[in-house]
């Protein structure tokens, strides 16, 4: 089981490297990694389990965040009522198209690998099309909007060596375009 002590923190070089693409069929090691990352997200969203193991809640976890420099990320995205609206493990994901219109979270973003609060809006495309493979090697392309699009962008950024605060406007952290959709 992945615990907070296993999460790589900001400053570790693996978080700033472009993750290596995986080949299929996935080895048992990478299949287990996918299961373990999803298990962390499920456990972290269960208040009793999270408290018992001192887990910070997460909606996404990329392989580099657990020290594995490979292109894989687990996502478990709830709606504002806590119901799961998107659950997937991406292998070798790419955002192949995105909307011009941006969206962001009203409270900004956080990250399991970043221990401090970094204030500011993190504008991301409101709609994205993600091309990826499943753990079983099935090729997929999906369109996402709103919160699932934000989480997908955050995790895919990890796979490209970027952290959420790289997207915050340095001069005015709370500046937004007029038509940016602010959610939650």
Swiss-Prot record:
Active site, renumbered: 155
Reactions catalysed according to its record: N-terminal N-formyl-L-methionyl-[peptide] + H2O = N-terminal L-methionyl-[peptide] + formate
Species assigned in the record: Lactobacillus delbrueckii subsp. bulgaricus (strain ATCC 11842 / DSM 20081 / BCRC 10696 / JCM 1002 / NBRC 13953 / NCIMB 11778 / NCTC 12712 / WDCM 00102 / Lb 14)
Family membership: Belongs to the polypeptide deformylase family.
PANTHER family the UniProt entry points to: PEPTIDE DEFORMYLASE, PEPTIDE DEFORMYLASE 2
InterPro entries: Peptide_deformylase, Peptide_deformylase_sf
CDD domains: Pep_deformylase (cd00487)
Binding-site list for Fe cation: 111, 154, 158
Protein name as annotated: Peptide deformylase
